[in-house]
A protein has these predicted regions:
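Transmembrane alpha-helix interface/packing and boundary motifs in multi-pass membrane proteins
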Residues: 14-23, 100-109, 141-152, 246-253, ...
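Membrane-embedded alpha-helical segments and adjacent helix-loop junctions characteristic
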Residues: 13, 27, 34, 38-130, ...
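Residue-level recognition of transmembrane alpha-helices
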Residues: 29, 60, 98, 119, ...
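Alpha-helix N-cap/start motif
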Residues: 44, 132, 174, 257, ...
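Hydrophobic alpha-helical membrane segments of integral membrane proteins
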Residues: 27-32, 110-117, 137, 149-153, ...
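Hydrophobic transmembrane alpha-helices of multi-pass small-molecule transporters
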Residues: 1-60, 64-66, 177-312, 328, ...
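Juxtamembrane and boundary regions of transmembrane helices in multi-pass small-molecule transporters
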Residues: 6, 65, 128-141, 146-159, ...
Length: 429
């Protein structure tokens, strides 16, 4: 059988498993690359090559640094300080919550940020006689959009970066995502404050699933044990984070991104901000293995021509010489709609290699197409299962499925329009 057909069959099975989640996402990705090796599509040396990719190392290091922020109490301290200064008026409080959440989500786990701030926000809302639902939905929204500002802010950013690397193409810089992430954050915050908040229901707080919140906090590296926090370690973790970000911003040749991240992670453990086991626990291993596995799948699609076959089919459906702006908008919609019902990490991993092939088939730069796919996967606001932050606020906010639809659909459309306008400015076709 033709190797391209074999690759497409493996991809189809992986897509089905990603959507249904009959088995864990990471297991699906690793099984896919293993199958490609067994079936002779990939040589043995390339089957698990994704695990040694520098982007995987970068992501692992930043996971540990982010976990240190939560474990030392730094993230919570920042959140409490900012939110309390905003007072108890609903709109200023909402603005403060969204801004601090965006900032924290850009450099750490957005799931951990929500889990960390949610109890604080509920307490303030109850004291101020404000319905928690009015502030919890903006919290989830801000966590989603904040992750789009840096490469490590959200898994889809890492996925699209890795896809470019696997294809041997120029890749995105660490802060390059800010060109679209910051404008989108500003637009979404302003929309929420002036228009979107009117769609957020005013409901009595539901029962907080303390186990779910605790699990999310622990996954991000927060202890959740209520133990006193060391201010010294808070300062140390903050200095380490700032130092790593500064090194990345300077783009030092002797200290590439992944080396800076690992150096910071080592310092977090050596200085006692995290114990060794806590550092391991702070890493999102699902994202690591899913990303590494799909890198090999992407390589197989490029090597066998399977990606080109899919791309040619899509382009032919849109007619000869399709407008790259229209094509980007269509791919944004596909990615965004798909993410409403499956993991944004999985949808980005599934679509990234296809996006590269489509861009190359029409003679366009893959960067704007990949950026649109990644952003679309992160800007999924319309269902409670689209992203972990959406799910976390579901119970405590007392939200229904339709509440997410009413609030999220306009934001998805706004994100589409803004992305189609902004992305080509910084990444021309």
């Amino acid at each position: 059988m033709d190797l391209a057909i074999i690759t497409l069959c493996v991809l189809a099975v992986a897509a089905f498993l990603f959507i249904t989640e009959l088995i864990p996402l990471a297991v699906t990705a690793m099984a896919a690359c293993t199958a490609l090796g067994i079936l002779g599509v990939l040589p043995s040396k390339q089957v698990y090559a994704g695990l040694s990719n520098s982007t995987v190392v970068l992501f692992g290091g930043m996971f540990v640094i982010g976990a240190a922020m939560f474990k030392t109490g730094l993230a919570e301290a920042i959140g409490i300080a900012v939110v309390k200064k905003a007072g108890t008026n609903q709109v200023p409080l909402m603005a403060a919550i969204m801004l601090v959440t965006i900032a924290l989500s850009a450099v750490s786990s957005n799931t951990g940020t929500v889990a960390c701030l949610m109890p604080v926000i509920i307490g303030i809302c109850q004291a101020a006689n404000i319905s928690p639902s009015k502030e919890l939905m903006p919290l989830a929204i801000a966590a989603n959009v904040g992750g789009t500002i840096t490469m490590i802010g959200t898994p889809p950013n890492v996925i699209v970066t890795g896809a470019l690397t696997a294809a041997g193409l120029p890749t995105f810089g660490f802060f390059e995502f800010a060109y679209i992430g910051i404008p989108l954050s500003i637009i979404i915050v302003l929309y929420t404050l002036f228009i979107g908040r009117h769609f957020v229901p005013d409901k009595q707080a539901g029962a907080m699933d303390e186990e779910a919140v605790k699990a999310a906090a622990e996954e991000a590296g927060a202890s959740g044990d209520g133990a006193p926090k060391s201010k010294t370690k808070m300062w140390i973790s903050g200095i380490i984070l700032l130092g790593v970000v500064a090194c990345m911003a300077l783009g030092l040749k002797t200290l590439p991104l992944h080396t800076a991240a690992v150096t910071g992670a080592i310092l977090c453990v050596v200085t006692g901000c995290l114990k060794e086991k806590e550092a391991y626990a702070g890493i999102d291993w699902v994202t690591i293995f899913l990303f590494a596995g799909m890198l090999s799948v992407a390589s197989a699609m490029e090597k066998t021509g399977a990606g080109k076959m899919i791309a040619d089919t899509v382009v032919n459906m849109m007619g000869e010489n399709p407008n790259p702006y229209v094509l980007t908008a269509v791919l944004f919609l596909i990615s965004n709609v798909l993410t409403q019902f499956m993991s944004n990490t999985a949808s980005a991993a599934l679509l990234a290699p296809i996006g590269i092939s489509i861009a190359q088939s029409i003679g366009a730069d893959p960067k704007p197409v990949l950026m649109a796919l990644g952003i679309a996967a992160s800007m999924a606001f319309a269902t409670p299962m689209a992203t972990p932050p959406n799910t976390l606020v579901l119970g405590p906010g007392g939200f229904s499925f339709n509440d997410y639809v009413k609030v999220g659909v306009p934001m998805c459309l706004i994100s589409l329009v803004a992305s189609v306008i902004i992305i080509p400015i910084f990444w021309p076709f």
